[in-house]
């Protein structure tokens, strides 16, 4: 299998899908990444854990409808061109 731009885009789509389906109460809370975790004090830089949680929440909020559309396009392309 050749490494093409389509393969790279499909891999990125799979990674974004993986982030989007993480359920906060079922999975993230069990590993200590739930919403009840403290952010930190005033004036402190947010840690990597809080930044990753913010990224996951943002992807789940913003990318819901675009992911449905992009996944549909990817399925149609796979059905048409194999």
Swiss-Prot record:
> Could you tell me where this protein is found in the cell?
Endoplasmic reticulum membrane
User: According to its record, what are the GO cellular component terms?
Assistant: COPII-coated ER to Golgi transport vesicle; endoplasmic reticulum; endoplasmic reticulum membrane; Golgi apparatus; Golgi membrane; membrane
Enumerate the UniProt keywords alphabetically: Diabetes mellitus, Disease variant, Endoplasmic reticulum, Epilepsy, Membrane, Protein transport, Transmembrane, Transmembrane helix, Transport
Task: Enumerate the Gene Ontology biological process terms.
Answer: brain development; cell maturation; chromatin organization; endoplasmic reticulum organization; endoplasmic reticulum to Golgi vesicle-mediated transport; gene expression; glucose homeostasis; insulin metabolic process
**InterPro entries named among the record's database cross-references:** Yos1
* TM segment ranges: 2-22, 62-82
Top-rank taxon, per record: Eukaryota
Distribution of this protein across tissues and organs: Highest levels in heart, skeletal muscle, and kidney.
Note one Pfam family from the annotation.
Yos1
Where the protein is mainly located, per its record? endoplasmic reticulum
UniProt membrane topology term:
Multi-pass membrane protein
**Biological function:** Regulator of endoplasmic reticulum secretion that acts as a key determinant of brain size. Required for secretion of extracellular matrix proteins. Required for correct brain development by depositing sufficient extracellular matrix proteins for tissue integrity and the proliferation of neural progenitors. Acts as a regulator of the unfolded protein response (UPR).
Q: Which disease is it linked to?
A: Microcephaly, epilepsy, and diabetes syndrome 1: An autosomal recessive disorder characterized by microcephaly, simplified gyral pattern, severe epilepsy, and infantile diabetes.
Family per record: Belongs to the YOS1 family.
Q: Know the name of this protein?
A: Immediate early response 3-interacting protein 1
Organism of origin: Homo sapiens (Human)
**Source lineage:** Eukaryota, Metazoa, Chordata, Craniata, Vertebrata
């Amino acid at each position: 299998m050749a490494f093409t731009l389509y393969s790279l885009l499909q891999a990125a789509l799979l990674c974004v899908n993986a982030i989007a389906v993480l359920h906060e109460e079922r999975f993230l809370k069990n590993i200590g990444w739930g919403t009840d975790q403290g952010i930190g004090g005033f004036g402190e830089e947010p840690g990597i854990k809080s930044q990753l949680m913010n990224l996951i929440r943002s992807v789940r909020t913003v990318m819901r409808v675009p992911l449905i559309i992009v996944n549909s396009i990817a399925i149609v392309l796979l059905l048409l061109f194999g």
